[in-house]
Amino acid sequence: MTDQNPFAASDRDRRAIWEILVRRDSDFFLSGNWSLVEGDYLDEGFLGIDAGGNSDASRWTIGFPTLAAYRQAALDSRLNQADFAEDLRTAWFRCQSLQKIDIGGDIGLAHKRIEGAIRRTTGPALELSWRSLFFMRRVQAGWKICGFVGYLPL
């Protein structure tokens, strides 16, 4: 995938969700600037489930019981451009896709895949291989992330 939104301008809901989950999320993850995505989340009731690469739901855990916990974990896992032998933003976009977004009324379910490799300056490439399901809610201000199940196996 590139940084070009694949959804038509006429598909406003999916286009907006893609902007939240791909463009802004990537820009935040690569910069560490939380203010880029701060308004994209519903704080009250937020929940992030960590599947830990396991398809057996009985082994999933409450990885991020609050938005603050998720924010800190995301900041702690930020990648550093100096560690990579290719442009990190281009590579990150190449390794992700978000082509399926189900919408029912004011609820959305987005299926995001992270899959590929990013060359490091030394050592083996960073291998990426997981998918996440994002739960979205439409409120007066637009679409917001209210939770997710992350690190699911492909």
Role assignments for model-derived ranges:
Residues 8-12, 61, 123:
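Charge-dense, low-complexity intrinsically disordered segments
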Residues 95-101, 114-116, 131-137, 150:
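Hydrophobic/aromatic beta-strand elements that line small-molecule binding cavities or substrate pockets
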Residues 34-104:
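A solvent-exposed, acidic/Ser-Thr-rich amphipathic alpha-helical stretch
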Residues 1-47, 54-55:
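Short, low-complexity N-terminal intrinsically disordered segments enriched in polar/charged residues
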Residues 13-18, 90-92, 145:
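A broad structural signal for short, well-ordered beta-strand segments within beta-sheet-rich domains
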Residues 47-51, 108-118:
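Short, well-ordered beta-strand segments in beta-rich or mixed alpha/beta enzyme
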Residues 109, 121-154:
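Short beta-strand edge/turn micro-motifs at domain boundaries
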